[in-house]
Amino acid sequence: MRKRELAAFFAHAAHETTNGGPGAAGGRYAWGLFYTEELGCADGHCKVYNTGGTSPYKPAPGKSYYGRGPLQLSYAYNYGLAGAEMGLPLLANPELVSHDGVIAFKAALWFWMRTQAPKPSCHDAICGKWEPTTEDRRSKRTPGFGMTINIINGGIECKSNDPAIKENRGDRIGFYRRFAGLLGTTVEPDCDCADMAPYGN
């Protein structure tokens, strides 16, 4: 199970930061950890992430909370909560997640391990420690890699039939299978979230 979890974490990190494509040397799944920030969000773009939602963590003036680091930590409420729990000024200085490798991985591991109800943590979902509620079962949310997709980006990727979105999910799954093979472990038969309802829907 530990190897499967490592494969899952590496798969999402590689997908979120890759610079590889179908014609890349070694194949698309040989790439990852290239980009440290979400593309197209510099210079004040991607304001959609500048929300604290109902959390106490509101955006700092002049700062932007787009995806940064191996798992592309996004939204002011995630930067604020991660910073508070790790003792780092991430709400005031979100760029630390892309400029400091140690902080980048701390933030990624924080997100991976942190339950944010009603979502379980990625760790619990992939390790089988999460027990789906009646609502989760009704929404076809089950433990495994597909559930980690749902936790990370389910609102966009799960239950979508858009070809580009399906390709994104397939890319995550391709990385997962590659890393599982490299680590000498297997993956579950259904790694997708195609039938799962995302949270909030």
Residue locations for each model-derived region?
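Sequence contexts marking disulfide-bonded cysteines in secreted/extracellular proteins
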Residues: 40-47, 123-128, 157-159, 190-194
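Short alpha-helical "patches" and their helix-cap loops
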Residues: 25-36, 90, 120-135, 164-174
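Short, well-ordered loop/turn and helix-capping segments at boundaries between secondary-structure elements
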Residues: 79, 114-118, 182-185
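Extracellular low-complexity, O-glycosylation-prone Ser/Thr/Pro/Gly-rich "stalks"
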Residues: 131-201
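Mature extracellular or exoplasmic CAP/SCP-family domains and secreted bioactive peptides
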Residues: 106, 114-141, 150
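Peptidoglycan-targeting cell-wall enzymes and recognition modules
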Residues: 5-114, 141-144, 148-151, 156-158
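Alpha-helix N-cap/helix-initiation motif
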Residues: 1-2, 97, 165
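Surface-exposed patches in mature extracellular/periplasmic domains of secreted proteins
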Residues: 1-6, 22-26, 119-129, 187-193
